Amino acid sequence: MTISTVCGFLPQIAISLFAGVWIDRYDRKKMIMLSDGVIAIATLVLASLFLTGYKSIWLLFIVLLIRSAGTGVQTPAVNALIPQIVPKEYLMKVNGINSSITSLIMFLSPAASAAILSIASIETTFFIDVITAMFGISIMFVIQVEGHVNVESKQKSNLQGIKEGFSYLKENVFIKRLILLLIIVMILISPAAFLTPLMVTRSFGAEMWRLTASEMTFSAGAAAGGVLIAAWGGFPNRMHTTALACALYGLLMIGLGIAPIFTMYLVFNFLIGITMPCFNTPVTVLLQEKVEPSMHGRMFSLVQIANSCALPLGMIIFGPLSDMFSVEVLLIYAGIFVLFCAMYVVLSKRFEV
């Protein structure tokens, strides 16, 4: 489990800094297609080796490394590409829909995988993954995107490009504070993200259906939240939307901590799922609006690194504490601090857009 976690996070973090430079330097559409294609080829090789009888856990780890690296390129590339093809007034709607689709996939994937594995081999699931990837690449191929090639950036080394990104972040105080807020909140919500299965087992029972229900209610809520933010569009001031979602998240974390019965816990978990895209989507749109297009790749790569590091860092803090205190206590106190973050955003003038 530890090795798979490292394989899933480390390459994504390691490649993101360089990926940001590449995304700002080359055609973003091609970067997305290339990363998806590399992942598909790695999965195809894995499926072929499994079919020949060569089945090794290390093969899975290697492919997981490649998939993680591909995600480290693809995710910031998608966020950087969206402003190129979407009018500014529709950014919130499109990013909300994108968030909803991602959450819906998370919601449906476990059930779909279980259904496929009940009637077919694991190799079949690998081939299905390759086919869906090729389908996605084909859709991306036909989308018309204005060429984005930064000739000036091509003349500089990757390290110079990374240095430029950090210099840009240092000079833009609002963006720096926004990313710092994201890191702090992600650390604080890590108990709700990772420790709730432990809470369910300790407080409500270790039956598998309870753990499944816990995961599915959050994913369903996140899908609904993406639809909500896409339809609503948020407040005219993006930071007010983020602050409201942050405050609700904190209150709902406290609700999780005091929920007396499992049904109430599931309701709070579903509502937390709704607040997540309402917090993340305005932040993404703000970066798309406020950051120079030539820096989109590098800034979104820094956000990717922040997200990838913050949750594990939170678990380094809250994991050992869960052996000393109940998860409920951790959720309540972390939720209070999340509320303080929301209050600071509203009351402080440091986040004025």
Predicted regions, residues:
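Generic alpha-helical segment signature
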Residues: 75, 155-159, 244
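Helix-interface capping motifs at the ends of transmembrane segments in multi-pass membrane proteins
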Residues: 48-55, 264
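Helix-loop junctions on the cytosolic side of multi-pass membrane transporters
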Residues: 80, 84, 126-156, 346-353
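Membrane-water interface of transmembrane alpha-helices in multipass transporters/channels
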Residues: 54, 58, 125-130, 208-210
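C-terminal transmembrane bundle of multi-pass solute transporters/carriers
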Residues: 4, 25, 31, 45, ...
